[in-house]
Amino acid sequence: MARLIFLGPPGAGKGTQAVVVAEQLQLAHISTGELLRAAVTAQTPLGIEAKGYMDRGELVPDSLVLGLVRDRLQQPDTANGWILDGFPRNRSQAEALNLLLTEINQQVDRAVNLDVPDPVIIERMLARGRADDTESVIRRRLEVYREQTAPLIDFFRDRQQLLAIDGNSEVAAVTDRLVSALQVAA
């Protein structure tokens, strides 16, 4: 069993690795973005509330996201473990997640940080060809990451939960490196 959080800058390959590793290790892949979209589509009480924020272009409050995460972590398919992708994004979310996990008798086993140099990230994201992925937008997203999310590396390192992985390779090579490191760390 493994309960994992995937960290790293935008374009590092978190989502890609989360899907592949979850499949290989038979873990539930939990994407907060997908949780939000599914709750809105299903018109759950949390989804209806979240939709109001999303329609106004506002960030969905942490309390709503945590409610969705709490519900998802208690589903039967998470019994063998899970990978949380896209959450937490800052220290206060990480602290709230730790409290939530304590309440439901779970804990994070490892926070995996995919380390990729900025020039590689910029190249990867430009290659995706998305309209909103201009170099200036990508650089701004990296700044926001450094300000808000990068401090989580120290947060999880201080708790001896951090697993740093070189993400500057082809997808399969990073996956192999990651799965091997998780097996050693288990």
Swiss-Prot record:
Localization per Swiss-Prot or TrEMBL: Cytoplasm
Region annotation (LID) ranges: 127-133
Residues annotated for ATP binding in this entry: G11, A12, G13, K14, G15, T16, R128, S169
GO molecular function: adenylate kinase activity; ATP binding
Catalyzed reaction equations: AMP + ATP = 2 ADP
Region named NMP: 31-60
Binding site for AMP: T32, R37, E58, L59, V60, G86, F87, P88, R89, Q93, R130, R141
Pathway noted in the entry: Purine metabolism; AMP biosynthesis via salvage pathway; AMP from ADP: step 1/1
UniProt-listed Enzyme Commission number(s): 2.7.4.3
Primary role: Catalyzes the reversible transfer of the terminal phosphate group between ATP and AMP. Plays an important role in cellular energy homeostasis and in adenine nucleotide metabolism.
Domain notes per entry: Consists of three domains, a large central CORE domain and two small peripheral domains, NMPbind and LID, which undergo movements during catalysis. The LID domain closes over the site of phosphoryl transfer upon ATP binding. Assembling and dissambling the active center during each catalytic cycle provides an effective means to prevent ATP hydrolysis.
Subunit structure: Monomer.
Protein name, as recorded: Adenylate kinase
Gene it is expressed from: adk
